[in-house]
Amino acid sequence: WETATTYDVGFDMDLFRNRLSIGFDWYRRYTTDMYTVGVSLPSVYGTDAPKGNNASLKTNGWELSVGWRDSFELGGKAFSYNVKAMVWDARTWVTEYINPTGALGDYYEGKELGEIWGYRVEGLFRDQEDIDSHAEQSFLQTLDKVTRPGQVKFADLNQDGKIDRGAYTTADPGDLTVIGNETPRYCYGINLGFNWNGIGISTFWQGV
């Protein structure tokens, strides 16, 4: 079974007669025996690897909230309102996974969830001389494999004179590198509400 163990430290405080509230938490979560797909099988098998308890993860995250609530008289009746802002973030890495070849298409130890591998862009080719002096990358450009001025120039990270993905493994990624991450970062939420004369409204916005 999948098991999660979380360690958490934080604080909560109320100031100005409980009108101002501040809370902060930092946590680290270890997930073991995560239920997920197994390492990819050769294409000759004609099917995907079965799922199982194949991976372990480590997550670091934090949450911060600041709130204010108060009341005053409006039209002879109490008008109360509250506003609360929250922001949080988390990152997760694979700590265990059976991937003996280090294939980039699967989980591997040290992989950050959501990471995007790709080629680093150096700009655009200015002219034919620029193309001739750069690493060979014609197979990345067009169906006719001809590189032309104005097309994207990719970085030759391993300095082997050609732009490719190598063995597509952690040991030999060719010119591939991590160029981004699709996991949302620095999520936020805002809660606003008021109550007056038996009428109450509460709203919540959330984004990244």
What is the meaning of each model-derived region?
Residues 47-49, 102, 175, 182, ...:
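A near-ubiquitous, low-amplitude feature marking generic local secondary-structure context
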Residues 1-120:
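Extracellular/periplasmic, surface-exposed regions of secreted and cell-surface proteins
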Residues 181-208:
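Glycine-rich, aromatic-lined ligand/substrate-binding cores of catalytic
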Residues 55, 71-182:
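Conserved small-residue
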Residues 9-11, 52-53, 177-179, 188-191:
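Generic recognition of flexible, low-complexity loop/linker segments
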